[in-house]
Amino acid sequence: MAGITIYEFDALTACPPSAPNASGLRAVPKPVFDWLEAQALAGGTAWLRLMQKGGRRAVQALGGYAGVIRAPDGYQIEVLPKIGRATSGDQADARARQLFIRMLCCLARFRHIQTESACLKAARMPLLEVFIGEFLRAAERVVKRGLRGDYVARRGNVFALRGKLQMAAHLRRNLCQRDRFFCEFDEFSSDRPENRLLHSALRRTLSWTAWPAHQQLARELCFVFAQIPQSAQPAQDFRRTRLDRSMAHYTSALAWARLILQNESPLTGAGGHDAPSLLFPMAEIFEACVARHLKRQLAPPFTLRVQAGSHSLVRHREQGWFRLKPDLLVQQSGENRLVLDTKWKLLDNARGNSEDKYGLSQADFYQLHAYGQTYLKGQGDMALIYPKTDAFRQALPVFEFQPPGLRLWVLPFYLEHQQLILPDCGSLDCSWSRSVPFQFSPKPAPVL
């Protein structure tokens, strides 16, 4: 199946296949470009905008989203995290794809991904095929454990007496058919919502996948579900699912089926079932990734709270307005000790001048100042956490707010090693014995 791999902020234009890329533009077939342009003009697509570049009409995949865009004709646009382009080394696409899979596993609703096998597949196949492969393996495990059935109430004119004879209906229908019985009975059947959903998801993946191994496995599984009808109303069937102890092995497969049938990624394109766009907000994924690993590596007695929202910026008529919600809050015995906020942006240690300011945002500093005044009462340490790249490999010198007392650190997070890189002294404050003891290496990570 035809497709292209791009990174966040890359621009796409319609070019003849033989025309070289110009001015950083990536070429896609004209029908695909026309569809993307129509999506941007229709509005409601947070991941796409119109632009002009090099004198050509183009559409830009906005930063902050990664995943797969699938055009109605099956053409796939794979959008990888921008950090993959900001690191050196061979096989950048494969490494970026593997890193994205590992990060995606940190989201609660995607923890069913088998990380190691998915990362191995990501080195040689597009993201959509990785997702399809994970679903097929999960469905295969369900089949090996056995499809669960349930008793379903039936009514019918049958040849043998079953269940309860419905006398009125029997006399009305069978006055001249002495060999029939109109009965109401319970029949054990595999036609239940969970199986209908899996069958529908299998049929859809069979139409999506271009990988021969996936096509073969999907056909084999569809044969197992052949006697079970597909789900006519997936949303209603998902509400009817019951995952009790005997259905625990269905959990992973149904989670993938929800993603496939309802396009239930955090962001879904406007293409509907014929053109699913499975895009994921990288800011949310990065926050979840940092939170998951810091929570494991914080030394006791410190604890980590995610999205704490106990303070407001102002009070008005006895109500708190403008809730202040730092991404992460480190506490000790209920006392706030450190405020952390994650940013999915790329910094550059070499741009440390008054004009470029490393690529930092003034708005982020205002935000952290408000957090420090409310959560730390104007005294203490805060940190902004950015992804580590070749250009941003070590913590920046501390930033001090005025009046003195509130300080801000800018730290890189090494995604491949799940490691927060602290300042050279090894803690956020070399002079404080009360400093939060993160158990991480203080030295810059090696170049990838």
Label for each model-derived stretch:
Residues 1-40, 270-448:
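Catalytic core segments in nucleotide and nucleic-acid processing enzymes
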Residues 2-270, 275-276:
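Residue(s) in the substrate-gating loop at a strand-loop-helix junction
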